[in-house]
Amino acid sequence: MKPNLQDYPKFYRWLTLPFSRKPHRVQVLQRTNRILTFVMPGIYGLVFCWLFFKKTSMGGIWPFIWIPASGFVLFSLFRHWVNVPRPYEKWEIQPLLEKNSSGHSFPSRHVFSATIISMCVCQLSLPFGMCSMLLSLLLALVRVLGGVHYPKDVLVAWGLGLAWGGLFWLV
């Protein structure tokens, strides 16, 4: 089936069909979302532990603070300004993830944050960074399957996280 976003409820039903047939998968999806939203900030904390144990100077630590922080602030301001409704607000769908907020769907801040954290890790260790990047992609998938973001929300957020993380190579 080719996705037709003009009929998002039909696309979402198709996307979540494996979950409607096996309800325990919904619990796995919800737990995965919860775990990843805790793991990614934990990974960011481990970045600073790594920098501390490597006795990195403040000048070396500073980019790991200002690049993610400035990106997060600018990203949040843009997101607030465009204020796109979430899929469950616009369409008659029942999301698999609980979300009580409205608007601010585009782009996904969870995915942007996870991606920029992964870019931090890439600066320290490419193999660990790639593992972290896979977690950010998994989070993107979970957010779409969960019905709290459109595919474009997470793809744009992931791309912006990669682009903003490119600042590491400029400093």
Predicted regions and their residues:
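Interfacial segments of alpha-helical transmembrane regions
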Residues: G45-L74
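Membrane-embedded catalytic cores of phosphoryl/pyrophosphoryl-handling enzymes
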Residues: E92-V171
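Transmembrane helix-loop junctions in multipass membrane proteins, especially transporters and channels
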Residues: F53-T56, N83-Y88, G147-K152
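N-terminal transmembrane-helix/juxtamembrane module of multi-pass inner/ER membrane proteins
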Residues: M1-Y44, G59, F75-S101
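Structural signal for the C-terminal ends of transmembrane alpha-helices
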Residues: H24, C49-T56, L124, V171
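Hydrophobic, aromatic-rich alpha-helical transmembrane segments
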Residues: Q27, R31, S57-I61, I65, ...
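Small-polar-interrupted transmembrane alpha-helices in polytopic inner-membrane proteins
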Residues: I65-R79, M130-V142
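Alpha-helical membrane-inserting segments
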Residues: F48, S70, L74, F78, ...
